[in-house]
Every structure is written in structure tokens, then in C-alpha cells.
UniProtKB/Swiss-Prot annotation:
Keywords, alphabetical: ATP-binding, Carbohydrate metabolism, Kinase, Nucleotide-binding, Transferase, Xylose metabolism
GO biological process, one term: D-xylose metabolic process
GO terms under cellular component: cytosol
Binding site for substrate: H99, R170, D280, N281
Protein's UniProt name: Xylulose kinase
InterPro entries: ATPase_NBD, Carb_kinase_FGGY, D-XK_euk, FGGY_C, FGGY_N
PANTHER family: SUGAR KINASE, XYLULOSE KINASE
SUPFAM superfamilies reported for this sequence: Actin-like ATPase domain
Organism: Rattus norvegicus
Reaction equations catalysed: D-xylulose + ATP = D-xylulose 5-phosphate + ADP + H(+)
Function, as annotated: Phosphorylates D-xylulose to produce D-xylulose 5-phosphate, a molecule that may play an important role in the regulation of glucose metabolism and lipogenesis.
GO molecular function per UniProt: ATP binding; D-xylulokinase activity
Residues the record lists as binding ATP: W355, G441, A442, N445
Amino acid sequence: MAERAGRRCCLGWDFSTQQVKVVAVDAELNVFYEDSVHFDRDLPEFGTQGGVHVHKDRLTVTSPVLMWVQALDLILEKMKASGFDFSQVLALSGAGQQHGSVYWKTGASLALSSLSPALLLHQQLQACFSVSDCPIWMDSSTTAQCHQLEAAVGGAQALSCLTGSRAYERFTGNQISKIFQKNPEAYSNSERISLVSSFAASLFLGRYSPIDYSDGSGMNLLQIQEKVWSQACLDACAPHLKEKLGSPVPSCSVVGAISSYYVQRYGFPPGCKVVAFTGDNPASLAGMRLEEGDVAVSLGTSDTLFLWLQKPMPALEGHIFCNPVDARQYMALLCFKNGSLMREKIRDESASCSWNKFSKALQSTEMGNNGNLGFYFDVMEITPEIIGCHRFNADNMEVSAFPGDVEIRALVEGQFMAKRIHAEGLGYRIMPKTKILATGGASHNKDILQVLADVFGAPVYVIDTTSSACVGSAYRAFHGLAGGTGVAFSEVVKSAPQPSLAATPNPGASQVYAALLPRYAELEQRILSKARGPLE
């Protein structure tokens, strides 16, 4: 993208699973430059597929740390070649794929702080890592370590109350624990352990960047209320871990000025600030500009809910993180596996493969579906753990089938009622000013969005989120520059492009769903108890 000279800006980076991406955002909050390096395509020598290596056991999934370093070299060289004016960059921040960890070898800090501008980063950091292939979020090889961690703190719910989530295989503490157990030498040779986000920030700083509260919440190690490492969790994972992690910081902290390497090699100004990097999900929350009481619903292959919470109630499902734009608040993530594929399956079966007919079915049926409720789980659901299709009539009797139109409304209403019930289970409450931001494939269907507005009793807006983690990182850089904790993020980003209104609740919707929601929750429990069978 062509760059206009002399445009003061902030950069937003995203070190994601498949690529490194950057955007430049000017003072009016317009994106005017973007670029990316795709790991498989642009760095084929690392032999990744989808940016990762899946190991023989099919459970272990890693990425080469030097691939990430080299990708940064490539993208900066591309920007330089395109004539990008680095001297106008006021600050930068970024995002990393969550949960992944990087292991810096003893002595690496010296190499980081004495980089020569004559050489590329990857030429100078070759010997800086004690683990060359980093565990990432797709890894599920740490079940034993998860059991050990939960047992050490008094069970899954106790761990969730402390850290915001029960033990998950991909969470960093369990991955560190596995490395300590399987490769104690690499662990003891690590002077610092970073998340992907704080690793990327360290490359820009020329010294170790602290982990931020929000991405730190995805480790099963941080006490989300007190914002300090939980000693009990650290002890359960590995010895001397506190020193290797460093102290966490608020997500909007300015962690320092950019390393002189970038000033000399690329022409960044010496005063360019680095704002703490965070996880890609928290950065997306910033990019979508969620505010208190808002919900973002990503309607994709799996459906994901992002919530802004004031008073979290950690549970055995979902994840609660410290909020990336307001350190006193929280955010939650809930994932539902049966998303668009389930909607497409019912479309094919009940609407002759036509979205048009699917929409007509939603238009021709009443809110509340005359009391008919359905649960549609083609694959084992995460929230809750149920599989199969279950249909109930207005008398709560299970039935084997619904007419096509009823089936379609039962599916869509059921999916959104489940989202509201599970969100409220984590402490979420709909407020008078609540907005729902819809993204992903199904957000183009106005009739699906109408049901979403009716079930939540709140207006639905659509927003373009193609680069939300990147753009959110640039917004966060502006926020850090403006003073971070002392300044409302919403003030800093108020001139950004507004989302567009797509649906408002129909009159009477709140009464209809006030009656249906408790019924849906009760039936869900009934199916769950039946699936689990009698207790041994």
C-alpha cells in the first residue's frame, strides 16, 4: 500500500499462527499501510504447514522461534523497500498468538542489548534460545501436567477462581511444566521465559519485555484479582519460575523506547515508544472497541463470544482475562464448536441448501418458536459437553423431529440462548447501553442477526474485523502514548470508524425470552445429566 510522506502514526503488529502482519494507523485513526509475511509461503525453509509443526503423536504442536524472528526481518525490509517513513512512528504495540512460550538461553539478554545494525536480527539471535521449537496454542500434549496443577491448588474450580480458567493443555504454565519435566536442561538454561507477545516486544526493546496482565491471564499462573503470579501455581509447574517470568505489568504500560538497532537500521525516531504487547484475543477486543457491557460475537466455523466484564465469576467453562484496555476490568472468552457448519447442515436439510429459504423460515416463524426448543451439536460441544440433536416441544417433551421452518428457528434461537446463558454464568449482565458486535460469515445474514438482537434484547452492529488484532494493537499504542491507565481507551479511539447498525430487538422480545431462557438452561442440564449417566 502506498505511503504518504510525513504521516505521524502508530504501528500495530500481530505475530499470529500463520503470519506476521503490521498496520500503520495515523492520528485520525485511519489505516494507511499494511503488510504481512506468511510463514509457509515466504519462509518455506522452516517446513511449516499452517505456520506449525504437528509432531508424530498428533498432540504436540510447535513453531520454530527463529522463523518468527526472520519474519520480522523480512517485513521490516519490505517496509523499507516500499519507502515507508519510519521516522514518523510515535509508538508501536502488538499482539501474539495466545499461550505460546519462548525460552531465552542464559546470556541472550546480552545479545539482545548489543545488536549490530549492519546485520539482520535472525543472524544475531541464532544461539539465543534454549528451546528451538516453541509449544503453541494448538498443542494438547500436557494432560498430565493439567491434572497435577489442578490437584496442587485444590481442584479445577479453585484454579479457575485464582487464574480465570481451569487447567487447559494449551495454557502456558502446563507447557512450561512439561518442558521442565521432559527437558530439565533446557529449562535450567533458560534465563527468561516469554509469551509470544512479550517475546515480540523484547525484539523491539532490545531487552526483555514484561508479560502484560491480559495475555498473562492465559497461563494458569496469574492471580487475575491481585495481578500477581500465584506462588502455588508456580510451585506446581517448575522451580525458580518467578524469576524466569519477571513481574507482569498493566497492558497499557509503556515498557520503554525502541532499541537503537531500529533507529540506526530503519530510521525509527529514538523516542519511539513500545507499549506492552498482549494476546491476539485481547488485542481484537481493543480493535473492536468493546466497552463496558458490550459483547462481540464471532460467527465462524466455531462461534466465539468476547465479553466485557466488571465482576467476573470464574467457572469450569470459558476463560476470564484481565481487560487489555482497563486494568480494573475483565474480559471473558467463550467458545462454541458447533457454529457455521451446524447452521449449514440445517440449511441443507431444512431449506434445500438455500440461505434465502433459511431466512424466509426465520421471517415466517414467531419469536419464541411457540415454545419449541432445540439443541444441535454435530460435534462434541465444549460449552456444554454435549453431542447430538435434541428437540423439545412446548411441554418439555422430547420429540424426534420438527417441521423445517420450526427446525431452523429452533437452531438459531438455541445457539443464541446458549451464548446468553453461558455468558451470564461468567458474570455478564446486559446493560441499557449494551451493544452487540457481530463478525464472521453469518454476520452478513440480517435475519440471523435479528434473532441475536431479540434473544439478547440489545442492538446488533456489524464491524469489519479483518485485521482487528493489528488495528487494536495500533489503537493500544495510541492509548499508551496518551497516558494509559489514567486515560479512558474509549476517549483515545472515539474518532475511529463506527460499526453499522444491523438489527434492533423487536417489541416484546424481552418478555418472550425471559420465559424461554430458564427453560433452555434447565433442558440443557437435563441433557447433560443424561449424557453423563448415573454417578458411579
